[in-house]
């Protein structure tokens, strides 16, 4: 859903939670978005056994993991996936065989300490160098919102989601090249303010929502479920973007003093724009990135064009991390307890199945939290440092 997607920098800033380390104070000027230094790899093989994480607790909670692995294997078995490998020292065959071997371990019925031991014997473990070359990764969350919507414009539904325009050009890897002009020249695609202000996409409307900020949330998250007037649910997913960098509206609201930094959240933004609808356009146009959509069947899809799974799918920078591969994360994540987000220490296996407009560095990782309002709350409470590992067959 993301490269789709999103950036959960919409979401909470400065959580302080015992256990896993919370993000450092702003004055320390840590940059989670620090680019990968030239010539370096994002993953470093762990050679000291003492530095390999304990997988035991994660081996007791394997729900939905097997299905998520199958989704990654479906992708890796497509010939088109081979163009993205090798990545560093990781080959396409190694990524595929590693998932197949891990799936066999799951199918064997091993769990807990026994599965932990088998993993340590059969797999090498790599760690992301993070934002500081010491493994520090900022974990944020994203989700699939569910909005009332329509595929036809009505008095209630006035705010469109647009299809990919015919003049948008991608390369063979799906990267945005720009806009093809009538003479064949390719130029940068216009930013959001020009697209919206000039009505460039008239006739390319895909669906309509009732609230302009809900449209923007769909842009940030990269997909949405629409509850249609007849009660049916439809999915609209990411098709492309205009090639511009993402800029956080949340940070703009804080900078302008509209919402205090210790109160910024998706819920606070929704509340602010409901009370100040005349400001929605002003703020969202500060983010030059514009997302185009397409109809999808079934569950929301990640950038691999495979379904994403709550807590089992992560979004990373696909230019530096091996897509579809098996990952392991240790951090603090919120879980739903009694219908409310409760933050807990977390370690779990995940699959690298998505990408995000704001997730462009070895120090960033976005965790998919599911669908609907509660998932949105969980995503909004996800802003925490941790460690990101990858597992490959020895």
Task: Name each model-derived stretch.
Residues 42-306:
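Secretory/export targeting leaders with adjacent low-complexity proregions
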Residues 21-24:
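Bacterial signal peptide processing site
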Residues 296-394:
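C-terminal soluble interaction/assembly domains
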Residues 16-19:
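C-terminal motif of bacterial Sec signal peptides marking the signal peptidase cleavage site
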Residues 1-7:
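Bacterial N-terminal signal peptides that target proteins for export
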Residues 28-30:
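N-terminal basic/disordered segments at the start of proteins
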């Amino acid at each position: 859903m993301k490269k789709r997607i999103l950036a959960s920098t919409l979401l909470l800033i400065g959580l302080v939670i015992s256990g896993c380390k919370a993000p450092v104070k702003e004055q320390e000027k840590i940059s989670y978005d620090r680019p990968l230094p030239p010539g370096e790899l994002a993953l470093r093989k762990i050679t000291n056994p003492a530095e390999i994480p304990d997988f035991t607790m994660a081996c007791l909670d394997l729900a939905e993991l097997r299905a998520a692995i199958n989704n990654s294997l479906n992708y890796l078995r497509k010939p088109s996936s081979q163009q993205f490998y090798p990545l560093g020292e990781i080959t396409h065959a190694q990524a595929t065989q590693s998932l197949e071997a891990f799936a066999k371990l799951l199918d064997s019925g091993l769990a807990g300490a026994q599965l932990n031991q088998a993993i340590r014997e059969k797999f090498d473990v790599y760690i992301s160098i993070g934002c500081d070359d010491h493994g520090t990764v900022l974990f944020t969350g994203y989700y699939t919102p569910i909005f009332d919507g329509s595929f036809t414009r009505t008095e209630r539904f006035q705010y469109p989601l647009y299809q990919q325009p015919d003049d948008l050009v991608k390369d063979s890897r799906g990267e945005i090249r720009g806009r093809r002009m009538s003479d064949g020249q390719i130029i940068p695609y216009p930013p959001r303010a020009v697209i919206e202000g000039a009505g460039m996409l008239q006739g390319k409307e895909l669906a309509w929502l009732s609230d302009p900020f809900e449209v923007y949330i769909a842009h940030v998250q990269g997909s949405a479920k629409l509850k249609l007037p007849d009660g049916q649910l439809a999915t609209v997913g990411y098709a492309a973007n205009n090639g511009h960098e993402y800029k956080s509206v949340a940070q703009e609201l804080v900078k302008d003093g509209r919402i205090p930094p210790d109160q910024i959240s998706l819920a606070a933004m929704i509340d602010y724009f409901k009370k100040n609808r005349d400001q929605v356009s002003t703020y969202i146009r500060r983010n030059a990135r514009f997302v185009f959509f397409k109809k999808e069947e079934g569950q929301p899809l990640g950038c691999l064009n495979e379904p994403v799974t709550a807590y089992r799918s992560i979004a990373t920078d696909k230019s530096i991390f091996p897509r579809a591969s098996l990952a392991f994360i240790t951090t603090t994540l919120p879980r739903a307890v009694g219908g409310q987000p409760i933050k807990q220490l977390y370690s779990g296996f995940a699959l690298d199945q998505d990408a995000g407009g704001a997730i462009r560095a070895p120090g960033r990782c976005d965790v998919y939290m599911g669908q609907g309002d509660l998932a949105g709350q969980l995503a909004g409470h996800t802003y925490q440092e941790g460690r990101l590992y990858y597992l490959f067959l020895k």
